[in-house]
């Protein structure tokens, strides 16, 4: 894959998304989104800034302390941004700002104001409107600005369901970026396989993965990396990554890069010393069989539930064949006996967030559509304390 093919979305795509939002808003209403703000790590040091995914989805703007306001009347639509003004002193210390003057052209919006004037301009812009789309409690700093502006609306709607459904269906450009995120993530996993050996620490492998991400233009992981040797792999969200890898153990790696704001997510398990034991191979091949079958079934018109039900049957039958479970397969499935070894779902939506937004419906029975992106990660977890044949 040519990793230089695309590094960001064209501004026209953000404009098109806003037009789709306007089409779903009722007349005489406004939709308001706030950006993320900088967050303190410890005294005088902030965490690296990461934009709110919804705000990014409609703006492509990567600065804190900003707001997007969409205004729809009976006969017109207007897009307004509030953002930090230029400040030469603060920009010398903390980095460049787009500024109010350049924002309309750069972001393709109608008007721009300093965020410092939100409390005075927001009432003027919305004084004749009756409804507001706003996700309260998502950003307390924004809720405070709204309260201080003293604007009252006849109706308030949560925009999250609407925007979540939009985000669920990826455009061709988004898919290309996510393919790149997936490829870079795969490079990291391949590097990990190449450098893993007994007595190396989990964090050493993590550092190799992160370095590979960085080499290909992905500065940050999309979530905290899991490098879990031996029994640590039975802790689903293990992130200590501070133990030595032991000869004869397996190591589970769950890691993904974030590229152009989009998440990669890959989980792989392999032997620390490079060679499976026979029992390890049997479990590995059972999981692989289930994964391949799930991928065959995850097609438009089917559902995650359909694929997961098949995965459960394959695993349960396989565990019976290996003597790990005992009894009738149908009865074991009905009793959920597999849950002690497979305690999570088959996968999740993937996009701007690693656990991306969008409805699943009951039991993940939602019909799959073109443009949805889902992870496929069945697993079998057998802890040291599990009551199973000794070889496992």
Regions found by a protein language model. Name each.
Residues 1-392:
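Active-site neighborhoods and metal-handling regions in enzymes and metal-associated proteins
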């Amino acid at each position: 894959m040519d990793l230089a093919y695309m590094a960001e979305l064209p501004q026209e795509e953000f404009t098109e998304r806003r037009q789709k939002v306007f089409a779903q808003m009722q007349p005489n209403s406004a939709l308001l989104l706030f950006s993320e703000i900088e967050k303190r790590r410890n005294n005088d040091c902030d965490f690296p800034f990461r934009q709110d995914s919804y705000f990014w989805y409609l703006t492509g703007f990567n600065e804190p302390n900003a707001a997007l306001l969409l205004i729809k009347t009976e006969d017109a639509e207007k897009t307004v941004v509030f953002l930090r003004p230029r400040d030469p002193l603060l920009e010398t210390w903390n980095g460049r700002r787009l500024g109010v003057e350049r924002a309309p052209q750069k972001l393709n919006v109608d008007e721009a104001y300093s965020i410092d004037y939100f409390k005075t301009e927001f009432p003027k812009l919305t004084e004749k409107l009756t409804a507001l789309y706003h996700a309260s409690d998502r950003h307390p700093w924004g809720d405070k600005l709204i309260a201080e502006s003293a604007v009252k609306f006849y109706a308030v709607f949560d925009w999250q369901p609407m925007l979540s459904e939009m985000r669920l269906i990826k455009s061709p450009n988004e898919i290309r970026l996510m393919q790149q995120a997936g490829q870079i993530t795969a490079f990291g996993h391949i590097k990990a396989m190449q450098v893993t050996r007994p007595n190396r620490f989990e964090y050493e492998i993590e550092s190799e993965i992160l370095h590979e991400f960085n080499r290909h233009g992905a500065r940050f992981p999309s979530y905290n990396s899991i490098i879990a040797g031996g029994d640590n792999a039975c802790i689903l969200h293990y992130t200590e990554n501070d133990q030595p890898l032991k000869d004869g153990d397996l190591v589970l790696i769950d890691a993904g890069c974030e590229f152009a704001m989009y998440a990669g997510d890959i989980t792989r398990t392999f032997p620390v010393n490079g060679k499976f034991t026979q029992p390890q191979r049997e479990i590995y091949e059972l999981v692989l069989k289930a994964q391949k079958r799930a991928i065959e079934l995850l097609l438009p018109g089917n559902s995650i539930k359909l694929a997961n039900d098949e995965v459960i049957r394959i695993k349960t039958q396989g565990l019976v064949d290996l003597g790990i479970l005992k009894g009738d397969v149908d009865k074991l499935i009905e009793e959920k006996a597999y849950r002690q070894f497979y305690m999570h779902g088959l996968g999740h939506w993937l996009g701007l967030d690693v656990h991306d937004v969008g409805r699943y419906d009951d039991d993940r029975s939602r019909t799959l559509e073109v443009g949805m992106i889902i992870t496929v990660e069945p697993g079998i977890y057998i802890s040291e304390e599990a009551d199973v044949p000794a070889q496992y």
